[in-house]
A protein has these predicted regions:
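ATP-binding N-terminal substructure of ATP-dependent carboxylate-amine bond-forming enzymes
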Residues: 1-113, 376-377
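Short glycine-enriched loops at secondary-structure junctions
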Residues: 41-46, 92-94, 118, 213-216, ...
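Short, charged, surface-exposed secondary-structure boundary motifs
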Residues: 68-73, 114, 120-126, 172-174, ...
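Active-site nucleotide/adenylate-binding loops and adjacent lid/helix of ATP-dependent enzymes
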Residues: 118-201, 212-216, 243
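ATP-dependent carboxylate/phosphate-activation module, predominantly the ATP-grasp catalytic core
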Residues: 177, 181-185, 191, 197-257, ...
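Conserved protein kinase catalytic/activation segment
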Residues: 273-274
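Peripheral (often C-terminal) accessory segments that flank ATP-dependent C-N-forming ligase machineries
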Residues: 299-379
Length: 379
């Protein structure tokens, strides 16, 4: 009997600054309704942990900051209980560890489709300017580790500038005082360095891409934001068709020999030039738009991870919209308690041993967190 394909996905936070995991899972389920989905969460309160039709099994992971050994030990314990065929990480902060663990994962039967370490390092915000020498237009930037160097910004970049965190968040600064404010906020949130990038006035485009690792582009969907949250995240958008943008995306993927998913943030400046503002090394939270546009890139990533051939797709057509919304998810406190206390939540039967791959890894202790909230009080 053929074993059910099991795909693990991280990034199940679905707030006003959502992770991509829920959208990636929705895309995979559209292509493979019978696939088993394992949700990997870093927080018990991530809404994707409890949303119906998302994960069959949800497990807590330790934060990437604890190191590769703790993260891999936990994953292999999960793998022993619910064998995983493909892992799709969706968060910036975890990518470097999963890239380092790729060979170990493969040796234990877990396939991935991730960028090479050197390409991942080059897309870091503090190294992105190096792409200029390779032929990609990138705004000038400074790497700031000491607020004492803020006065240099006026001479080297001029104002306004964009102040960016190491992993997430970006704010426009008009003055040195603004830079100092955002520097401390971002350093406290994400650590050093903080990146100061020259502000480019113009029109922003976001492009989700899937590279084959040999310089080829499997597929892409370009989008222009129509609604924004106060964090600048897309709450609505529409696909666009632009041959110059398509060529820019293909050239960037070719220069990087990018392997796996990514999101390119591109600015068409008022001067008519295209500038690469940022590369996010994973699917964006709006990736379900790719399904609506007829380019199911998450499923293509699963196929590539499994070694299956995937033909390159033409750019998506213009005029497909998405609108994000929020809703209240109702759940039992027992589900929250199961994930909080035991580190796992199951909505489907755990696979029988004869439905599992022999991974040769002992079942480790479950992640245990703090006790749940009291709901009944004495009179």
């Amino acid at each position: 009997m053929k074993r059910t394909l099991t795909i693990a996905v991280t990034g199940l936070n679905a707030t006003d600054n959502p992770g991509p995991g829920v959208a990636v899972i929705r895309a995979i389920r559209d292509a493979c309704p019978d696939c088993r989905i394992v949700g990997l969460a870093y927080e018990t309160l991530d809404p994707g942990n409890y949303m119906p039709g998302i994960a069959d099994h949800t497990y807590l992971l330790p934060y990437p900051s604890v190191g590769a050994e703790a993260l891999s030990d936990r994953l292999f314990a999960i793998h022993a209980l619910t064998p995983i065929d493909v892992l799709i990480p969706t968060l910036d902060a975890e990518l470097p560890i999963w890239v380092r663990l790729r060979d170990l994962l493969a040796a234990n039967g877990i396939a991935t489709f991730l960028p090479e370490a050197d390409a991942l390092a080059l897309r870091n915000k503090d190294h992105l300017h190096e792409l200029t020498a390779l032929g990609v237009s990138v705004p000038d930037s400074l790497v700031l580790t000491d607020p004492a160097n803020i006065p240099k910004i006026a001479d080297e970049l001029g104002y306004p500038v964009v102040v960016k965190g190491r992993f997430y968040d970006a704010y426009v600064a008009q003055t040195p005082h603004d830079v100092a404010h955002w520097f401390h906020k971002l350093a406290n949130a994400w650590g050093l360095p903080v990146i100061i990038q020259k502000f480019v006035p113009g029109t922003e485009f976001d492009v989700v891409c899937l590279g084959d690792g040999d310089g080829g582009l499997i597929g892409s969907v370009a989008m222009r934001k129509m609604q924004l949250t106060d964090k600048g995240k897309a709450w609505g958008g529409v696909t666009v068709s632009d041959k110059k943008l398509d060529a820019f995306v293909r050239d960037t993927i070719r220069i990087l020999s990018w392997r796996g998913p990514c999101e390119l943030e591109v600015m068409r400046g008022d001067d008519g030039k295209l500038y690469l503002i940022e590369i996010n090394p994973r699917f964006p939270a709006w990736v379900y738009l790719s399904v609506g546009a007829g380019r199911n890139l998450p499923w293509a990533a699963v196929q590539l991870a499994l070694g299956e051939p995937v033909a390159p797709m033409p750019p998506a057509a213009a005029g497909v919209m998405f609108l994000r919304h929020s809703r209240d998810e109702i759940l039992s406190l027992a589900d929250f308690a199961a994930l909080t206390v035991h580190g796992e939540l199951h909505r489907a039967p755990i696979p029988e041993p004869d439905d599992a791959a022999a991974v040769g890894v002992p079942q480790a202790a479950k992640v245990t967190t703090h006790a749940t909230f009291p709901t009944e009080f004495p009179a």
